[in-house]
Every structure is written in structure tokens, then in C-alpha cells.
Amino acid sequence: MLNIPALILSCIIWSLLWLLFVALCLRHFPWAMAHDYPPDMQQAAALPAPTPAQKRRTTLFAAAVFAILFAFAIATTLLAYAGQPASFATSFCHLWLMGMAWNAVDLLLLDWLLICTLGSPLFLLPNTAHCAGRRNFRFHFIGFLKGCIAMSIISAGLAVVTFGWMHMMR
């Protein structure tokens, strides 16, 4: 049985962490996020190719971010079901719902509201506020569908680790 209060809290915090990391990445490593924008916005941003040092910092940032996000997902799932038997399906559903919650926040709040509708400078590539692609809702919906697949795969991997850890701690 899912621990709904813990799941809701995990979804909110995880989505806020993702939003923070996306904003930081866009400010400090925009070339790492350019593929998440329509082609005309990528062209208008005219981002220079990253130097080897910038690539290294981007890789370190991404590794740290994913380590934090995945550790948070595993830890909150372990805490949500501590002291009670939880099946693999329960672990997977908890993690999958966390992933889908972020994916929905990414589409509805970040992409459609902050980028497409409001044009928030915090989430736009440099020099792209004027681009027609800024209002390309379809582009972001396709990204959402890809995110559903990616989050399903990631959730399965995290569920294997989490479920294994649960059984080792018994």
C-alpha cells in the first residue's frame, strides 16, 4: 500500500529540487540544456561551444545533481516504508509517481507556463525571448512524452536499488 502523505511530500520536494537544478544549469551551463528548446531558440541563443574546462564542470555538475536527486528518491522511499513490508511494486509505484509528478511539473509549470506563456528570463536561453519557438507548446509536449519513457526507466532502476536495500536492511 502506498504511503500517500509521504509520496506527496516527496513529489513536491523532488520537483522543487529539479526546478532549482534546471535554473542553475540554464544560468551556468546553458549549452547542456539547449536541446530542450525548439530549434529556432537554439539558433537565436547562438551559444558558443563549451571549452574542455566547461565540459568538465558541466559533467561534474550533472553527476552531483543526479547523485543528489537519485539519493533523495531512494532515501524518501526507504523512509516512507520503513518498518513495514513493501513490495517491489510499491517501491516502483512510489518512485514512478515521483518521476511523473516532476515530469508534469516540468511540462505544465516550467515549459508551458514559465517558458511558453510568461517567457520567464530565469528559464529562457539568452537572446530567445523574441523567438516563435518560445510558444511551441507541441515541442514541449513531445518532450513530456519522452520524459514519461525516461522516468519510467529511471524509476525501474531506482526501484531495483531501493527494493534490494529494503531487503538487505531486514
What does each of the following model-derived ranges do?
Residues M1-L97, A101-R170:
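Juxtamembrane/disordered regions of integral membrane proteins
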